[in-house]
């Protein structure tokens, strides 16, 4: 069985789930899967994927896992008590061949947000591992280890990068769980203080690594349907986050509606309240410069704020960003696929995104063309109108 612990997921799933329990327990949502890698035939593996998901739905939290969560300063005891009763229910997920053909599969997760939020990360990890264990029956781990050593060597070679730290954000698109755990341990031992932590809660617990994460796109997307007014949905999301965490976990995700809309909403109050912001699409250098100017315009010293970069990073890009912004702000880098699925094979670009909340379409208007995902073109156009965002000429809104 691929997933053997419900902690084998990213920390931000638990931080968002706690907000859902306390503020949106009645919300109903729908998520959909998409593989962005062309020419990949996943249909032959449907039965294997279903079997693995069935195993996932048999899991419960162990006492030692609950105790670990309870010790986190931002996790409340009633949430841990809820998790003690929790399990994923197979009735909320369907996995079928897509009517489009071409090897595509449809994975639809639909049900109460509180009871479906933990599906995404392990299901993506399952799809990845099932695919690669069938297509690469004798993985070249030697090549993977050599590539990982080169990355560690590159980051640690120059003394001016001694304060440049990276984190593992690679659970969802990892080659396999065994390889992911080896990567996390190799980074911990090879980078020392340059390894900031991991988003994976299980490996954080097992190996005394710092767990990292705050919010994901789905949280701010859901607020489109849960807030009082669509135009204020991003503000509403940040306010509810602050209401729950009272200044803790203060990294705001910036690209649900694009950078312009984010800066319009992220006023002086939020600039001072939140510790920083996370970049996940668009040009990271331009984004960083705009964030620093925005902090200065709102009477915040950028040197006290954190810029988190997490979009398709590799070590050379991390180093370029560090060189550009070091000394001007605090920096954090989350590296995903390039760490956990770099053995010489083409990684799958797969996602599971929320598409509806309480029966209403929800969407992400990314700063990167092709990253937006919405099944309702009319709603996407309306959302752009409300937030004053132009339609990118090279984006297929139906994706």
Swiss-Prot record:
Top-rank lineage group of the source organism: Bacteria
Top EC group:
ligase
Instruction: Spell out the family assignment given in the record's similarity comment.
Output: Belongs to the NAPRTase family.
Question: What is the native source organism of this protein?
Answer: Burkholderia cenocepacia (strain HI2424)
Q: Which Gene3D superfamilies match?
A: nicotinate phosphoribosyltransferase
A Pfam family (short name) is NAPRTase
Cellular component per GO, a single term: cytosol
Any idea which residues bear Phosphohistidine here? 217
The gene for this chain is pncB
- What's one GO BP annotation on this UniProt entry? NAD biosynthetic process via the salvage pathway
Question: Which UniProt key words apply to this protein?
Answer: Ligase, Phosphoprotein, Pyridine nucleotide biosynthesis
- Protein name per Swiss-Prot or TrEMBL: Nicotinate phosphoribosyltransferase
Recall the GO molecular function terms of this protein's record.
nicotinate phosphoribosyltransferase activity
| Chemical reaction(s) catalysed | nicotinate + 5-phospho-alpha-D-ribose 1-diphosphate + ATP + H2O = nicotinate beta-D-ribonucleotide + ADP + phosphate + diphosphate
Enzyme Commission number: 6.3.4.21
Function according to Swiss-Prot or TrEMBL:
Catalyzes the synthesis of beta-nicotinate D-ribonucleotide from nicotinate and 5-phospho-D-ribose 1-phosphate at the expense of ATP.
